[in-house]
Amino acid sequence: MKKVGAIILAAGMSKRMGKPKLLLSLGGKPLFRYSVNTATAAGLKPIVLVGGKHIEELRKHTSDLREIEIIENRDYESGMASSLKAGIQALKGRTDAVFVFLADQPFVPPIVITKLLESYDQYRKEGVRIFRPKYNNVLGHPVLFDAELFDEFEQIQGDEGGKSIVQKHYSSLMAVPFENSEWGFDIDTTEDLLKLKRIAPKYIKQK
């Protein structure tokens, strides 16, 4: 069995939201904890949580989880790429592959991770290096990258994340389908926040 870790990107500035969305309370927990909990429930190790301006709050809200490694990205204002590079650097040589999670997607269930891992085990030997969930025909996160691609993250810049790597290696990508589009829901705007509150009771026990 390959060793698979996780990077959870939690250093965003929430410019479109106007407030730190990852600390918003949902079901008695800050929003980012749902991605963390999904990664831990799936047995991913190591798990790296990359934070920025609100790093101390991230530490406080994960103090019960010894397995979480928190990395401070002091260059968080430059965009997502700097956080992703910091996470990859922390996991180089320690994992065979890594999931890249967005910290504002609270509805991704562990079954998504399980199915992607099963696909990785089955198809890596056939040359597939990127595995992505496809929620009701829309590609989403978390994305699983094989360690063979880690060096390429050194070239990414700004807010692109891993997009350029996905495009470059699209022929080596496998999309794993899921019917539920809400599993891939993320929060960027106040309108998204309203939708979040509307659909959350279906997935999260409210407190």
PLM regions and their residue ranges:
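Conserved beta-loop-beta/alpha segment of the NTase-like Rossmann-fold superfamily
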Residues: 77-151
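Hydrophobic packing residues within well-ordered alpha-helices of enzyme cores
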Residues: 17, 58-62, 116, 153, ...
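Conserved N-terminal catalytic core of the sugar/cofactor nucleotidyltransferase
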Residues: 34-97
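Short aromatic/basic micro-patch
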Residues: 25, 107, 143-144, 175, ...
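Hydrophobic residues at beta-strand termini and immediately following loops
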Residues: 26, 71-73, 133, 176-178, ...
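N-terminal glycine-rich phosphate-binding loop and ensuing alpha1 helix
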Residues: 2-52, 58
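Conserved alpha/beta core of the MobA/IspD/sugar-nucleotide pyrophosphorylase nucleotidyltransferase superfamily
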Residues: 2, 151, 155-207
